[in-house]
Amino acid sequence: MMIDFPVTEETILPNFKGGEKEYAAKMFFDGKNRIMCGRLIPGASIGTHTHETSSEIIYLLSGTASVVCDGKPETLTAGQCHYCPKGSTHTMKNNGTDELTFFAVVPEQ
């Protein structure tokens, strides 16, 4: 099954999960799993949240992300991947000067 993100409508989510500014995402949801192409402008973030019934895989396409997962800070750049296991808590912020773009998968477990 093909998901054509270039023609998928973008959703703007202000203060997503208690984060700063807004998260823009093109999303596919089949009732159980989410596949997203997202972007954060400089200074924007996805707030701290726990993956109680899912994990999350985030692959950076461009920009620099500051991620904290279970209290451990990480800095990610394009081509790197962040994994948040089921039961873990994380947050992500664009602390750079360029737009942050990423591909994310949230499979229910």
Identify the residue ranges that each predicted region occupies.
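Structural motif
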Residues: 64-66, 73, 89, 99
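Glycine- and acidic-residue-biased ligand/ion/polar-headgroup-sensing regions
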Residues: 53-65
